[in-house]
């Protein structure tokens, strides 16, 4: 990877419509439906993660779909950062944060 200190966040990581075997890395209750690159970028910016958007990239598992990716600062485990980004998108969409059980 050319950018040290960065994590790659693919939209598939937080997409509620995808299965774990197709790329989702967080739970369905914390994921969002069909996240867009701009939503991920805005959420990462709100979290202070210095996002860089690469719209021409394709997720390797579905190489025929050019979904793009977002590079963010590496400030912890990828799953934790993906969950924070997803919850930030949910807040912005007005869905709210899921209740803790």
UniProtKB/Swiss-Prot annotation:
GO molecular function, one term: 7S RNA binding
Alphabetized PANTHER family for the sequence: SIGNAL RECOGNITION PARTICLE 19 KD PROTEIN (PTHR17453), SIGNAL RECOGNITION PARTICLE 19 KDA PROTEIN (PTHR17453:SF0)
NCBIfam families, A to Z: PRK00754.1
GO cellular component: signal recognition particle
Coiled coil: none
Keywords: Cytoplasm, Ribonucleoprotein, RNA-binding, Signal recognition particle
Compartments it resides in: Cytoplasm
UniProt record, GO biological process: SRP-dependent cotranslational protein targeting to membrane, signal sequence recognition
Annotated InterPro entries: Signal_recog_particle_SRP19, SRP19-like_sf, SRP19_arc-type
Encoding gene per record: srp19
Domain of life: Archaea
Function noted in UniProt: Involved in targeting and insertion of nascent membrane proteins into the cytoplasmic membrane. Binds directly to 7S RNA and mediates binding of the 54 kDa subunit of the SRP.
Keyword Zinc-finger (UniProt): no
UniProt name for this protein: Signal recognition particle 19 kDa protein
Family: Belongs to the SRP19 family.
Quaternary structure annotation from Swiss-Prot or TrEMBL: Part of the signal recognition particle protein translocation system, which is composed of SRP and FtsY. Archaeal SRP consists of a 7S RNA molecule of 300 nucleotides and two protein subunits: SRP54 and SRP19.
Signal peptide feature range: none
Predominant place of localization: cytoplasm
């Amino acid at each position: 990877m050319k950018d040290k200190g960065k994590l790659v966040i693919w939209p598939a990581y937080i997409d509620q419509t995808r299965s774990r075997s197709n790329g989702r890395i967080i739970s369905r209750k914390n994921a969002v439906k069909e996240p867009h690159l701009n939503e991920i970028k805005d959420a990462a910016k709100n979290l202070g993660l210095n996002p860089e958007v690469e719209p021409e990239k394709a997720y390797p598992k579905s190489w025929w779909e050019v979904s793009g990716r977002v590079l963010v600062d590496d400030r912890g485990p990828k799953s934790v950062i993906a969950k924070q980004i997803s919850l930030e998108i949910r807040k912005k969409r007005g869905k709210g944060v899921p209740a803790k059980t």
